[in-house]
Amino acid sequence: MSLIRLNIDSFRNIQLAQLSPSSGINLIYGQNGSGKTSILEAIYFLGMGRSFRSHLSQRVINNEQDKLTLFATLNLPRGDSKIGLRRFRSGETEVKIDGEKVKRLSTLAETLPIQVITPESFSLLFEGPKSRRQFIDWGAFHSDPQFYAAWVNVRRVLKQRNQLLRNNSSYDQIQYWDREFVRYTEQVTEIRNRYVDSLNELLKGIIGEFLPQVDVKVSFTRGWDSKTDFAQLLESQYPRDLATGHTVSGPHKADLRLRVGSLPAQDAMSRGQLKLLVCALRIAQGKLLKQQIDKHSIYLVDDLPSELDAQHRQLLLKQLVDTGAQVFVTAIEPAAIVDSLHMPPSRMFHVEQGRVTVIE
């Protein structure tokens, strides 16, 4: 799977651009503020309906316009597919896939699986369990068609349960929701656990390539003691939940634990090693997707030269090439990427003040 055409209209400082990317390595270079990262952001927006840089999606709309438009043609095994997205400053979003209106943004994510390696993505190991849970759920969503519905129901029931707790409801009033919570939690937890087990099998070899001297252990924690029955736990913790006004334990507290010996990885490894670990996680996740559903991710790699030294840039790019996936990578100077590849990039684009030029 790859993008074979990308149209960008009124996205940040890009007024209008049309790209015909290669299915291999696409190098996008230009000075800071030129708009090169905006191209990656536009691809991500098309696949996720939001930015990887700002939670306020209206900010990505060009200041002089009231809407942005993104359009892409995807090359898929079954033939080409067309995706279009329009976001208005009011917050309204219109999405079409092959001319048909799409109501759920999750359909975009399913159609266009994207992996991001940016300076911000290294927060995976530092910002607490939420980002690591999102990492697991990305894989669970793509690997099991039952996951999304169960995950939506967990969130719905948890919201209702927390509202009842804030209303000082009796346990009799909460019991019905607890039965629902347990049912959907079991589904979500089983899929998450199965996914992490599969990821681990791939991850060991990839971590060995990036960090041969470091023994990293990866494990899944479900959000409560695995030896405790979840239904009994909810009942026994009801007084505590009532006092705090929210559900203390459950799938919303799940985490991906990464340890070196007895220490968390972030305490045992240097910042450079942690960056390599995140790269290994992203590579493994993309490879597992290909194994499980025979679909490639699209990799967006931003500002690589500032994040990794020449040796590790070369290693990461080799791993990315080996996945067979389409890759978009940015740099200020093209030589920093070209010199790290065994062969020239399949396609190069220069960006200056929001204008994109193909370099032949």
From Swiss-Prot:
The keyword Cell division does not apply. Transmembrane segments: none annotated. One of its GO terms (cellular component) is cytoplasm. The keyword Oxidoreductase does not apply. One of its GO terms (molecular function) is single-stranded DNA binding. It is found in: Cytoplasm. Keywords: ATP-binding, Cytoplasm, DNA damage, DNA repair, DNA replication, DNA-binding, Nucleotide-binding, SOS response. GO terms for biological process: DNA replication; DNA synthesis involved in DNA repair; double-strand break repair; SOS response. The RecF protein is involved in DNA metabolism; it is required for DNA replication and normal SOS inducibility. RecF binds preferentially to single-stranded, linear DNA. It also seems to bind ATP. Belongs to the RecF family. This is DNA replication and repair protein RecF. It comes from Shewanella sp. (strain ANA-3).
